A protein has these predicted regions:
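Alpha-helix initiation and N-capping motif
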Residues: 55, 79, 98-101, 113, ...
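Short, surface-exposed acidic
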Residues: 70-71, 223-226, 273-279
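Short, structured secondary-structure boundary patches
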Residues: 57-67, 87-93, 111-120, 245-251, ...
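Non-catalytic terminal extensions that flank enzyme cores
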Residues: 1-15, 33, 38, 65, ...
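Alpha-helical structural motif
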Residues: 54, 85, 208-211, 245, ...
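Short, mixed-charge aromatic SLiMs
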Residues: 46-56, 234-238, 286-294
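N-terminal Rossmann-like or analogous alpha/beta NTP/dinucleotide-binding catalytic cores
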Residues: 1-112, 203-204, 208-221
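Active-site cores that bind ATP or allylic diphosphates and position pyrophosphate for catalysis
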Residues: 100-241, 248-253, 302-306
């Protein structure tokens, strides 16, 4: 086995669908084609949005499709670890809502990221004091970004990326949790702790990368490499959702669609097959090439396998 370590990181906030399974397939094939190790990490920290049974269903769907992995972790079981990581960061509690941040902006910023002007810097002595001030809302932890902080990295798929984080994002949120158990901090800390060498994920998460690189370096570690691939979208160009029809893997299973048929569609959209004929995930390992994957989103205008 090579030194490559990848990871699959489903979230139980919803059912697996063609979009996230395609991204997982690219991540899995990338690792296995390089003789690497694969980690399964259930990212179940967003409790208000978690769906009952979704975690078990995701594992079952992935195994049905032919995925396997070498280690398995559950984020909700790792809260003490996130607390230790939070203690190493220059972070402070913030009570600002999204509307507060939007109204504080003096000029628009590109993309979906909001620039935070540091309103709560030095305002509260503790999380508890901030929580009392904004009750019943919950404060968040923010990472204090030093002036003139620019992050640059070479993405295996998206190419060279540079962002002046201090000028475009400011002090970014880490977690809306007293222990720091939230996506931005937890995903970064876990990737480092689990030895992940490359993060393969959808390009909707490209904006999350500069903050995660800053977190890694703040605790004295070098971040993994990154590879952000295009999403599967509906005709409106937006990520797959209920409005685009039922693309859940569970729905295809119930309709009698074979796992090889689903993987065949993924292979075709990734440039690994000339047609969407059925094929197993394992059979794609030898032919996988990151260079074959189109640099444009996959648009679903009608449901496959109908």
């Amino acid at each position: 086995m090579s030194g490559y370590v990848g990871r699959l990181a489903p979230s139980p906030t919803g059912a697996l669908h063609l979009g996230n399974v395609r991204t997982f397939a690219i991540a899995w094939l990338r690792a296995r084609s390089l003789g690497g190790k694969m980690i399964m990490r259930m990212e179940d920290l967003d409790h208000p949005r978690d769906k009952p049974g979704a975690a078990a269903q995701a594992i079952d769907d992935l195994r049905w499709l032919g995925f396997d992995w070498d280690e398995e972790f559950v984020q909700s079981e790792r809260r003490p670890f996130y607390r230790t990581v939070l203690a190493k960061l220059d972070a402070y509690p913030c009570v600002c809502s999204r509307r507060d941040v939007e109204s504080a902006q003096s000029a628009p910023h590109s993309g979906e990221q909001l620039f935070y002007p540091g309103t709560c810097r030095g305002r509260f002595r503790s999380w508890e004091e901030a929580a009392e001030a904004c009750a019943p809302r919950i404060p968040c932890w923010r990472f204090r970004v030093p002036p003139d902080t620019t992050v640059s990295f070479d993405d295996a798929f998206a190419g060279h990326v540079t962002q002046d984080v201090s000028a475009t994002l400011g002090d970014f949120p880490l977690a809306r949790d007293p222990d720091g158990a939230g996506y931005t901090l937890a995903a970064t800390a876990d990737d480092l702790d689990m030895g992940v060498t490359e993060v393969v994920r959808g390009d909707d998460l490209l904006p999350a990368t500069p903050p995660q690189i800053l977190i890694a370096r703040a605790i004295g570690r070098e971040p993994p490499s990154y590879c952000h691939v295009p999403l599967v979208v509906g005709p409106d160009g937006r990520r797959l959702a209920k409005r685009h029809g039922d693309t859940r893997i569970a729905a295809f299973r119930a309709a009698g669609v074979s796992p090889e048929k689903v993987i065949g569609w993924i292979a075709y959209t990734c440039g690994l097959s000339a047609d969407d004929y059925p094929v197993s995930l394992a059979d794609l390992v030898g032919r996988f090439s990151l260079a074959a994957i189109p640099h444009t989103a996959v648009v679903i205008s009608s449901l496959p396998f109908a």
